[in-house]
Design a protein with these regions (language model features):
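Exposed alpha-helical structural elements
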Residues: 8, 43, 134-136, 140, ...
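A short beta-sheet element
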Residues: 82-140
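Short, tandemly repeated low-complexity microdomains enriched for cysteine and small residues
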Residues: 8, 86, 112, 149-157
Length: 178
């Protein structure tokens, strides 16, 4: 592509409503140094570490309004069901947390950038690399969960977030997940 610097890689998602040769642009990953002539293995655990936390039941916080989000498995409002006066998970814009819904709206992935609490219906992960583009990452993760039809299946979440190698082929300026 003319005018595109080599260090930029365009990321495209295959849309199931269009022909497989058509892709939607979702963003650019800057400064990605990668050999574009071969298939690469990418492991989720190379980029994220699981965050251990004590889950809080919704009923214990619903009647205690406040400024801290309570993250659940909803697909709406960045996964936030309500706000309370309690938080037990530290997050910030410079140190964000990724939440992945286990059930309910299974597979939805969100970025949490403020201190919050969460129930047991989500899994939390922290990026190992601060340069990772989290917006694109969330789009790619949600797309992968939908592709394998993830729902109510803990072994699948474990496979996707720890054991599974994504085959990634970089061809000129786009990435395709097999």
């Amino acid at each position: 592509m003319a005018g595109v610097k080599d260090e930029n890689v365009f990321v495209y998602l295959n849309d199931t409503n269009v022909l497989s040769s058509e892709f939607k642009t979702v963003g650019i990953i800057p400064k990605l140094k990668i050999d574009r002539t071969k298939i690469h293995k990418i492991k989720f655990s190379d980029y994220f570490e699981k965050v251990a936390f004590k889950s809080i039941m919704d009923s214990k916080l619903e009647n205690k309004p406040g400024i801290y989000p309570h993250v659940t498995s909803t697909s709406l409002n960045n996964g936030v069901k309500f706000y309370s006066d309690f938080w037990n998970i530290k997050a910030s814009k410079s140190d964000p947390i990724i939440s992945i819904n286990n059930d309910g709206s299974a597979g939805y992935t969100f970025i949490q950038t403020h201190d919050f609490s969460a129930n047991s219906h989500v899994k939390l992960f922290k990026p190992k690399n601060n340069e990772l583009n989290l917006i694109i990452t969330c789009l790619l993760l949600t797309n992968q969960f939908k592709k394998i039809k993830y729902s109510f299946n803990q072994p699948t979440l474990s496979m996707l977030t720890h054991d599974f190698n994504y085959d990634v082929f970089v061809y000129f300026n786009w990435i395709d997940f097999f």
